[in-house]
Amino acid sequence: MKHKIILIISALCLAMGTLAQCPVRNTAFSGGEHLSYDLYFNWKFIWFKVGSAEMDIQQTKYKGQDAYRAYLITRGSKTADRYFVLRDTLTTYTTLDIVPLFYTKNALEGKRYSKERVVYSYNEEGITLDLTYQKNSDPVRKNIVTVSECPYDMISMLLKARSFDGSKFKVGDRIKFLMAEGKHCEEQYIVYRGREKFTNDYTDVTYDCLVFSFVEKEGKKEKEVVTFYVTNDKNHIPVRLDLHLKFGSAKAFLHTAKGVRNK
């Protein structure tokens, strides 16, 4: 009996310890920030503008508690639609200290339309994820997963990454995290690539950036999915994203930034 009590107490302490590690101190953004991007695609060594993207953060309520709602919308142009249709909307709700609460993704990519949803629940037993995924008219796939580490979706992880302190990283450092999607929750990595000065040729603005890569596991190998450049200042604004796609490569460059937290 005594041994069982110790095990139960240890499990509760582990769970509460995990929950205590989830919040992060956010000093990079606040509600009201709006970022717009131009999208470019590489075709036979030539870069073409193929669409736009917008990222917006607002302070709101989620089930009665203060929260951030952040969304990322990508839209291909009519010209690009002749070759590949792209209409993605990703939305996440987090607490004000960037603990994920809810995530959805609706994506029209080519002829495939998919819907994803992740609902996060936190309690003494750990963190439970209610996952939902559907592609085209296929049956809805549902799954419930319990994890002991803090999970993140694509958008909430990007928000958390904006609070990273670049002075504490060395080139090659790896940040492990759980990536939650509609189909599954898997261990992934963000790799710190170092500092780099980047000039946006379309706006003629030069940025001092911290560079990170999101790396995805494929069996025993790793695949670099997105490399993102964030300003090396208090705002840590993503000013450039390099996307490594199955059908080529694409880039997103910051066009305008409004409502930034630190002037």
Task: Cite the ranges covered by each PLM segment.
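Short, linear, compositionally biased motifs with a strong N-terminal bias
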Residues: 11-12
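Bacterial N-terminal signal peptides that target proteins for export
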Residues: 1-8
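Hydrophobic, well-structured mid-protein blocks that either form specific transmembrane helices
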Residues: 116-159
